[in-house]
C-alpha cells in the first residue's frame, strides 16, 4: 500500500514538472520571444536616421514560391514616441474605389477597406500589429471619429516628405507588376495618395515623373495604379 502511494506521488511530481515545463515553453513562445522581437524592432527604428530604411512585416514581393519577403520602409519622420513609415516600393495594385456604387471618398473607398483588412492581416504578425498606431481620420461629412492603422499618405505628406519630383518616383515589386501595376521604360510606376476628406470621386496619384496630380471620375476605378503603404508605429511599447 505504501509503495503504491509512493508511486502515485512520484507520478504527481512528474506531472507537475511536465506542466511547469510546458508552461515555460508556452510563455517563451507566446510572450517572451515576441516581446523581445518587439523591443529589438523598436530599437532598430529609434537608431535608424530619418530618411533611411528599416524592415518591418512581410509581404509577397518577388513572385516566387519562396514565401513572403520582409517589407522595406522609409522612415519619414519621428514625433515624440512614434515614427511614420512608408513602404520603399509599391507593394501591390488596387483600385481606389468603384464609382458605380456611388460617390467615393477615402472613408468608403475600396482601397481603404483592403488596406485595413486584407493587407493588414497578411503583412503583420500579432506582435508587429501591437506596434501599429491608430491614426485619426477627419471627415467633415461625419462627426464620428474614424481611425486607420494602415493608410495612404495625403497630398500634403507626399509633397512635404518628398519635396522633389525625383524623390517621389517609386518602383513596384515584381509581385505588384504581376497584379497589374504598369511601369515606364525606367521601371517607375503610378501610385495612389489619399484624397482630401471633403472631395468625392477625386483621387490623387504620383505619376512616372514624380509629379503629384489629381484625376476624377472613372479614373479612380483603375486597378493598374500601385499602393505605397504608410503606417505610424509606437516607439514606447
Stretches found by the model and what they are:
Residues 1-2:
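N-terminal intrinsically disordered, acidic low-complexity segments at the extreme N-terminus
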Residues 5-21:
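N-terminal Sec-pathway targeting helices
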Residues 39-237:
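Collagenous Gly-X-Y triple-helix signature in extracellular proteins
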Residues 25-47:
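Sec-dependent signal peptide cleavage junction
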Amino acid at each position: 500500500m505504501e509503495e503504491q502511494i509512493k508511486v502515485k506521488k512520484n507520478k504527481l511530481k512528474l506531472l507537475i514538472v511536465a506542466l511547469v515545463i510546458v508552461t515555460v515553453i508556452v510563455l517563451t513562445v507566446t510572450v517572451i520571444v515576441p516581446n523581445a522581437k518587439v523591443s529589438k524592432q523598436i530599437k532598430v527604428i529609434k537608431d535608424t536616421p530619418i530618411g533611411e530604411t528599416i524592415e518591418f512585416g512581410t509581404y509577397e514581393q518577388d513572385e516566387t514560391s519562396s514565401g513572403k519577403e520582409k517589407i522595406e520602409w522609409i522612415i519619414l519622420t519621428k514625433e515624440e514616441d512614434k515614427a511614420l513609415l512608408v513602404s520603399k516600393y509599391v507593394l501591390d495594385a488596387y483600385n481606389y474605389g468603384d464609382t458605380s456604387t456611388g460617390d467615393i471618398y477615402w472613408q468608403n473607398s475600396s482601397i481603404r477597406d483592403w488596406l485595413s483588412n486584407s493587407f493588414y492581416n497578411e503583412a503583420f504578425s500579432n506582435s508587429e500589429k501591437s506596434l501599429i498606431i491608430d491614426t485619426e481620420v477627419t471627415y467633415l461629412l461625419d462627426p464620428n471619429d474614424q481611425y486607420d492603422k494602415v493608410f495612404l499618405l495625403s497630398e500634403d505628406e507626399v509633397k512635404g516628405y518628398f519635396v522633389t519630383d525625383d524623390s517621389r518616383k517609386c518602383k513596384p515589386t515584381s509581385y505588384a507588376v504581376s497584379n497589374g501595376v504598369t511601369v515606364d521604360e525606367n521601371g517607375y510606376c503610378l501610385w495612389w495618395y489619399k484624397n482630401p476628406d471633403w472631395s468625392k470621386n477625386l483621387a490623387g496619384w504620383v505619376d512616372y515623373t514624380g509629379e503629384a496630380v489629381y484625376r476624377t471620375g472613372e479614373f479612380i476605378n483603375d486597378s493598374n495604379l500601385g499602393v505605397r503603404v504608410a503606417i505610424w508605429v509606437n516607439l514606447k511599447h
